[in-house]
Curated annotation (Swiss-Prot):
The gene is Depdc7. Strongly expressed in liver and to a lower extent in kidney. Belongs to the DEPDC7 family. PROSITE patterns: DEP. This is DEP domain-containing protein 7. Residues 46-136 form the DEP domain. It holds the Pfam family DEP. SMART domains: DEP (SM00049). GO terms for biological process: intracellular signal transduction. PANTHER family: DEP DOMAIN-CONTAINING (PTHR16206), DEP DOMAIN-CONTAINING PROTEIN 7 (PTHR16206:SF9). InterPro entries: DEP_dom, WH-like_DNA-bd_sf, WH_DNA-bd_sf. It comes from Mus musculus.
Length: 511
């Protein structure tokens, strides 16, 4: 795989970032510093970089939306890459509070999801299930045939710094409450736009690099070429004006029912129906209980249908079985945090289509597995029923043992809220590397994940002596305390040790 340096050279980054390529009217002298500049820069970056497109929630389409976790990822990368607050480590929780402030100041708003006619409390959620929309973009939910695409930065350029009229004092209070102080102007880096190709290459290289540190892989070919082997789930393009009217009405009935229920279980199940074929959805609608308030019958119908569909289709994560084995091995050895990070990295490498379908299914599995929820089978625990029904929908490979598959599936269910987040360490590494490219430095020097620590010659010499001494003392202690050795044998070994390492012997036993 080509290195980032080679990719950057091929794309002529130095020319891309020359003064001639800067935006019209750009001038360092014109740039404001401090709290106001940081705030405006965050808004501009969020509006131009977060993925805004048509999304679905409970089978209802919402135009021009982005998800909460992606907003946090964009702002986190922006703050760490540009070092607005110096070298201070910024935890993800503080970025979430920044997003809450952006929502409080009407930069963006939550896409309203009504439950019995009431709006949910406008609290920002770092989740891939929460939808938001910029307030500068008109609501277009009622338009049909709108393309599901990412909008260009120009769409927001005129509104980038007009989202809210906020005084500098208020912004300074905001950063102070977060224990963050904007660095002085010489340390603030003027961000220049990098090619998406370079950014994606950096993300992929660093994600794979870190994954290789956590998981022992015998072969790298499958990992490096994983984009070619990801199974593509059969997806039918269902636009309102292109589907059979009867099928669309059946989906509409289920959507209306879901919108009327204040039930997380039913909402999660209906979200999964998006991936079921039309005929299965028609069957669900036609067999719907005559008493809609019998939610137990509704849940039984939905669970059986979703389970039946995923038992017959291609597993979502069936490729890269060696990674699955590696993650399961970490779990067996009790290294849960490392297993979680490895899972986050693995899912970061997935294509967006598979990732979204897997997110919905895993969310439904986690809700259905809750022991306080609807009893799926009288004599079985919900958690075990869900594992048994959906394990093969996630991983079904003869190279992964059943025990490891079960362990991995249960782990995914228990951590479904965290597995789709990007590790903070990866964010920081990528930001540092992108900053090096922007400044024209070698991106591979002193950046990225490394497998050993660089030290100078004198430090190496002293470190070697200390390590050797520590190991010799440990060996001497083992000989001295070994009760299995006879007195004659122990005396002989101690004599040999004293002859070859008198200083260590004296230090251990004294004069």
């Amino acid at each position: 795989m080509a290195t980032v340096r080679e990719k950057a050279a091929a794309l002529n980054l130095s020319a891309l970032h020359s003064p001639a390529q800067r935006p019209p009217g750009f001038s360092v002298a014109q740039k404001p510093f401090g709290a106001t500049y940081v705030w405006s820069s965050i808004i501009n970056t969020l509006q131009t970089q977060v993925e805004v497109k048509k999304r679905r929630h409970h089978l209802k389409r919402h135009n021009d939306c982005f998800v909460g976790s992606e907003a946090v990822d964009v702002i986190y990368s922006h703050l760490t890459q540009n070092k607005f607050f110096g070298d201070v480590d910024i935890p993800r929780a503080k970025v979430v509070r920044v997003c809450q402030a952006l929502m409080d100041y009407k930069v963006f708003e939550a896409v309203q999801t009504r439950v019995f006619g009431k709006d949910k409390k406008p609290t920002f959620e770092d989740s891939s299930c929460s939808l938001y929309r910029f307030t500068t973009i008109p609501n277009q939910d009622n338009q049909l045939g709108h393309e599901n695409k990412v909008h260009s930065p120009s769409r927001y350029s005129d509104a980038s710094f007009m989202s809210s009229d906020i005084k500098s004092d208020s912004l300074e209070d905001l950063w102070e409450n977060l224990s963050l102080k904007p660095a002085s102007s010489p340390h603030i880096h003027i961000s220049t736009r990098l090619s998406p190709q370079v950014i994606n290459e950096v993300w992929q290289e660093e994600t794979i690099g870190r994954l290789l540190q956590l998981v022992d892989l015998p072969f790298l070919d499958s990992l490096l070429k994983q984009q070619e082997v990801v199974p593509k789930a059969p997806q039918s393009k269902r636009q309102p004006d292109m589907v059979n009217t009867s099928n669309y009405l059946d989906r509409g009935i289920l959507r209306a029912y879901g919108d009327s229920q204040e039930d997380e279980w039913i909402s999660a199940a209906i979200d999964c129906l998006e991936y079921l074929p039309d005929q299965m959805v028609v069957d669900i609608s036609r067999n719907f209980p005559e008493q809609p308030d019998r939610t137990d019958l509704v849940k039984e119908l939905l669970f059986d249908a979703i389970g039946r569909y995923y038992s017959t289709r291609e597993p979502l994560l069936n490729h890269l079985y060696d990674v699955h084995n590696g993650i399961a091995e970490l779990l067996v050895n009790g290294k849960t945090e490392m297993a979680l990070e490895a899972t986050q990295l693995f899912l970061k490498l997935q294509d967006s289509q598979n990732r979204e379908e897997f997110r919905r299914l895993l969310y439904f599995m986690a809700v259905a597995a809750d022991p306080s929820e609807f009893k799926l089978q009288e004599e079985s625990d919900n958690r075990m029923v869900v594992k048994r029904v959906f394990s093969k929908a996630i991983v079904n490979n003869k190279n992964v043992s059943k025990g490891k598959t079960d362990l991995l599936v249960l782990f995914l269910m228990d951590h479904q809220k965290d597995v789709f987040k990007i590790p903070a360490a990866l964010h920081k590494i990528v930001s540092v590397k992108l900053l090096a490219i922007q400044k024209g430095r070698d991106p591979n020097k002193d950046t990225g994940y490394i497998y050993c620590q660089r030290i100078d010659e004198s430090e190496y010499s002293s470190s070697t002596k200390k390590k050797t001494k520590d190991q010799l003392l440990s060996l001497l202690k083992t000989i001295d305390e070994d009760s299995k050795l006879s007195a004659k044998e122990k005396k002989k070994l101690l004599g040999q040790f004293r002859k070859t390492h008198p200083d260590i012997f004296t230090e251990y036993f004294g004069d």
